[in-house]
Amino acid sequence: MGCGCSSHLEDDWMENIDVCENCHYPIVPLDGKATLLFRNGSEVRDPLVRYEGSNPPASPLQDNLVIALHSYEPSHDGDLGFEKGEHLRILEQNGEWWKAQSLTTGQEGFVPFNFVAKANSLEPEPWFFKNLSRKDAERQLLAPGNTHGSFLIRESESTAGSFSLSVRDFDQNQGEVVKHYKIRNLDNGGFYISPRITFSGLHELVRHYTNASDGLCTRLSRPCQTQKPQKPWWEDEWEVPRETLKLVERLGAGQFGEVWMGYYNEHTKVAVKSLKQGSMSPDAFLAEANLMKQLQHKRLVRLYAVVTEEPIYIITEYMENGSLVDFLKTPSGIKLTINKLLDMAAQIVEGMAFLEERNYIHRDLRAANILVSDTLSCKIADFGLARLIEDNEYTAREGAKFPIKWTAPEAINYGTFTIKSDVWSFGILMTEIVTHGRIPYPGMTNPEVIQNLERGYRMPRPDNCPEELYKLMMQCWRERPDDRPTFDYLRSVLEDFFTATEGQYQPQP
């Protein structure tokens, strides 16, 4: 037993349990429960929480308490539904589904990790974005739904315990831009952007700059808008029965088969790739799919589940805007500025740098195999599938389906696919991006492309392609694979292509 010394007790009740002689706080009996007797004679069992060891919890808000950022409707046996703003206690934190108990209903079940945030932290604030890079802050703020003055506060990438403010603004020359301000720490725990005015906390800082710009580029209008996150896939559902899938809309046909928008178990929107019968060995596919599902990154299309009997189905996350090559030709795609186009290239190269780090080769990198979300986020699809195809029209270089125009010379001539042949393909993909989906080597047949490459020919610089970007393409097309850059290098160049010569943060106002 122990005392949880507090400054005072409420004086409208009297207890019929032992109290501490020093502070008169109730001492928890051995059964961990106490009976409180109110002056009106009613009795209630007090849910005093027992704790291990001799010391009480340091904070009244325990670390395992979370608040729901969004409402969630249960859709599996064992998951727990909740309303936005509801408090839950996390019982087990493992993987993407956490076991929790609702403090409202007392019920227990599994909850999606990305629908909740720690209650005793900044995470529930709509303007706070945890683990967000400067570049991703720009992408979020420039996405549809945000306007002039939209803002967010994020953790500093370089200094632990520090923060940055990112604000959407309008520039006469550049159009919609995002400006960044360092939020500096005071020795006493406060914060400031300008030394002229300091704040005890970030909430006070946000309130001040919401009322007036006071030296910032603009007044803060509203927190950055984000969509409800996609719930994680239920972990036990990998090889699924075909009847659990309902194919709704045929989105297109590719080298491997048809792609459909559909629903899994009537409630989860997914993309379903139906592979042509005989196009690959089911056993080889399942072995590769088991490897592919371990490759999880925000720039890779997430593989959810498979149907392993022919025709093979691959179930992945659904991307609303379809393939990049098609999206670039739409009215929305045609309007994209060179800045946004290069940002798409930077997103793709980020995913390829991840595959490079994992020693994984794509083998078929082109705009047709990049998918685009409704917020213009780009993700790489079909990584690894190309080597499983058993169709001679695809595997032989003379075949009608072989993607000659995207393939490195050593892969065309000798079948040598490496991460460096992927780098060559990425150079071709960049031409697709800056030309809004134009087929590479316009006017040339596949045999003509092969002959010209053997003579050292390279595509000329496309119209509206920055000179520095074309130099990067030419590096990707170097004859010797080892002379081509790494994806990690390409990522570092493309992420800051237009900001390398500018200050990344605004001066103090």
UniProtKB/Swiss-Prot annotation:
Catalyses:
L-tyrosyl-[protein] + ATP = O-phospho-L-tyrosyl-[protein] + ADP + H(+)
Lipid attachment (N-myristoyl glycine) is at G2
Q: Which domain of life is it from?
A: Eukaryota
Write down which residues bear the modification named Phosphothreonine: T159
| Classification via Gene3D superfamilies | Phosphorylase Kinase, domain 1 (3.30.200.20), SH2 domain (3.30.505.10), SH3 Domains (2.30.30.40), Transferase(Phosphotransferase) domain 1 (1.10.510.10)
Q: Which UniProt keywords apply?
A: ATP-binding, Cell membrane, Cytoplasm, Isopeptide bond, Kinase, Lipoprotein, Membrane, Myristate, Nucleotide-binding, Palmitate, Phosphoprotein, Proto-oncogene, SH2 domain, SH3 domain, Transferase, Tyrosine-protein kinase, Ubl conjugation
Question: What is this protein's record name?
Answer: Proto-oncogene tyrosine-protein kinase LCK
**Subunit structure comment from the entry:** Binds to the cytoplasmic domain of cell surface receptors, such as AXL, CD2, CD4, CD5, CD8, CD44, CD45 and CD122. Also binds to effector molecules, such as PI4K, VAV1, RASA1, FYB1 and to other protein kinases including CDK1, RAF1, ZAP70 and SYK. Binds to phosphatidylinositol 3'-kinase (PI3K) from T-lymphocytes through its SH3 domain and to the tyrosine phosphorylated form of KHDRBS1/p70 through its SH2 domain. Interacts with SQSTM1. Interacts with phosphorylated LIME1. Interacts with CBLB and PTPRH. Interacts with RUNX3.
Q: Highest lineage ranks of the organism?
A: Eukaryota, Metazoa, Chordata, Craniata, Vertebrata
Cell compartments where the protein resides: Cell membrane; Cytoplasm, Cytosol
Please give the activity regulation comment for this entry.
Answer: The relative activities of the inhibitory tyrosine-protein kinase CSK and the activating tyrosine-protein phosphatase PTPRC/CD45 determine the level of LCK activity. These interactions allow rapid and efficient activation of LCK in response to TCR stimulation.
Task: State where the record puts the cross-link Glycyl lysine isopeptide (Lys-Gly) (interchain with G-Cter in ubiquitin).
Answer: K99, K276
